């Protein structure tokens, strides 16, 4: 006898229902008689359970798919929040301080750290309440919570105290100091003194390559690293080993991490377990860096970055969130591949080469005047680069003139670029953003190694395959 189909989860029902009604152009209630027939056969076992999620017979997906904003009560105050969110996300959007570790906006919640604990009350007469995890509790209309109560605060303080039992007090020498999420959350809950005087558990660190440093003794077991590396990025050589108080996050054997996106562990980790090894010899604290928004020129995606500089040298490159381009992550090429700008052979100031070979320094105003003089003679040609920004290529073309400018790639590539531009402007073809790629039903790739030509797109393709596997 064939096995019974698995009982679908609520999120799977929502996705499948949405897909069906988008194709059918249907906007009436999905709970109406016969409305769920187009869905998978296993959904019939879920109908009764799903109806229990509807409060008072009101369907939040009726009225053409529009849902009302639920009202919740937190510490006596009423708030209107976005439907479909959990309590932690709602609190963060409202500007309320609720500590957390394991939750990440790109990876969701697993309730591993127990740090976002709050007290939920059944109704206004309930005086005891029960402790629930904010990241695992969906917001519902009329729900009552307490963040600032003694019960919730005491629970969160005990969790931080247990996390700090084996944590080393090496903040002054930790590369994460000054931007450590654990530091911020520890201060937020008010934990100050260690009562435990026993011996701490210690771990042996691993060599993970020339780019990432490993310090396992700082781990708080939030599982962010393996959830990102294995589930999100598709890596296979980093895992959670052992169990209980001896959980170890690393490789079975020492070696270089194989994923092209391993560098994101530096930002995903809320403590200093994974840090940027390129800062070891010339370490700089975050508050000493001069940072400015920039764009990665490693490929055509144009990921948003935040490079940090000190003493005229680039120290590091961090991700800068942009939902339509790169989201929360960069590829390793974009994160670690900009070190060439610190080369001693790179020109650090403008100058003019004399006939006798001398190189005389000029200020920027003098250099621009000299360039204008040389370009006006008609004897200077400009060669652009696909690695440079569009603005830089345009300024070079403007300076030397259209007849003396070459784009920096072959005629065949020029034809392809022209054809692609024509298709984009004069056809129904669109350039999808990261979110569109991640939610695509089907993707066709023609003769291209996406991982090498556009790594961030390759990471989005992994999400598309992963999301479809969960449906």
Question: Where do the protein language model's features map onto the residues?
Answer:
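Short, small-residue-biased leader/transition segments that mark boundaries at the very start
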Residues: 4-21
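A short, aliphatic-rich alpha-helical micro-motif
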Residues: 14, 110, 437-438
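Intrinsic disorder at enzyme termini
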Residues: 19-68, 327
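Fe-S ferredoxin-like electron-transfer domains
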Residues: 44-46, 52-65, 114-297, 301-305, ...
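Short, contiguous acidic and Ser/Thr-rich linear segments
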Residues: 79-84
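A basic, amphipathic helix-loop patch mediating RNA/tRNA/ribosome contacts
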Residues: 87-121
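Catalytic alpha/large subunits of respiratory electron-transfer oxidoreductases
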Residues: 164, 168, 215, 222, ...
């Amino acid at each position: 006898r064939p096995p019974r189909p698995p009982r679908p989860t609520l999120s799977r029902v929502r996705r499948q229902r949405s897909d069906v009604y988008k194709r059918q152009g249907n906007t009436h209630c999905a709970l109406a008689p016969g409305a769920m027939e187009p869905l998978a056969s296993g959904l019939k076992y879920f109908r009764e359970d799903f109806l229990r999620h509807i409060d008072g017979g009101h369907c939040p997906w009726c009225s053409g798919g529009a849902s009302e904003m639920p009202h919740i009560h937190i510490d006596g105050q009423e708030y209107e929040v976005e439907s479909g969110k959990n309590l932690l996300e709602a609190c963060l959007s409202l500007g309320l301080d609720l500590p957390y570790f394991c939750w990440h906006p790109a990876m969701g919640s697993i309730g591993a750290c127990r740090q976002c604990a709050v007290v939920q009350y059944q109704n206004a007469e309930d005086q005891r309440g029960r402790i629930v995890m904010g990241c695992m509790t969906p917001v519902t209309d009329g729900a009552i919570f307490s963040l600032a109560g003694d019960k919730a605060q005491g629970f969160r303080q005990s969790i931080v105290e247990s996390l700090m039992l084996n944590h080393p007090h090496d903040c002054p020498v930790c590369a994460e100091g000054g931007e450590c999420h654990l530091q911020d959350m520890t201060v937020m809950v008010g934990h100050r003194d260690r009562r435990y005087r026993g011996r701490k558990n210690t771990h042996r660190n691993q060599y993970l390559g020339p780019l990432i440093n490993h310090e396992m003794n700082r781990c708080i077991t939030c599982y962010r690293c393996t959830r990102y590396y294995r589930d999100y990025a598709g890596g296979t050589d980093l895992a959670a080993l052992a169990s209980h108080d001896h959980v170890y996050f690393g490789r079975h054997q020492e070696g270089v991490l194989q994923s092209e996106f391993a560098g994101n562990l530096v930002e995903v980790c809320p403590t200093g377990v994974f840090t940027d090894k390129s800062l070891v010899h010339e370490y700089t604290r975050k508050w000493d860096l001069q940072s400015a928004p920039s764009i990665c020129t490693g490929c055509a995606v144009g990921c948003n970055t935040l490079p940090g500089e000190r003493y005229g040298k680039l120290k590091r490159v961090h991700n800068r969130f942009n939902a339509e381009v790169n989201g929360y992550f960069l590829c390793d090429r974009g994160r670690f591949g900009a070190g060439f700008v610190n080369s001693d052979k790179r020109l650090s100031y403008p100058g003019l080469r004399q006939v006798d070979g001398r190189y005389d320094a000029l200020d920027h105003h003098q250099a621009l005047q000299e360039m204008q003089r040389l370009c006006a003679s008609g004897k200077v040609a400009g060669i652009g680069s696909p690695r440079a920004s569009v603005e830089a290529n345009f300024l070079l073309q403007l300076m030397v003139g259209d007849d003396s400018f070459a784009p920096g790639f072959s005629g065949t590539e020029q034809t392809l670029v022209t054809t692609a531009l024509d298709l984009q402007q004069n056809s129904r073809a669109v350039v999808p953003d990261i979110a569109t790629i991640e939610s695509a039903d089907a993707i066709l790739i023609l003769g291209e190694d996406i991982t090498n030509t556009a790594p961030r797109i390759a990471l989005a393709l992994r999400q598309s395959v992963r999301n479809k596997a969960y449906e």
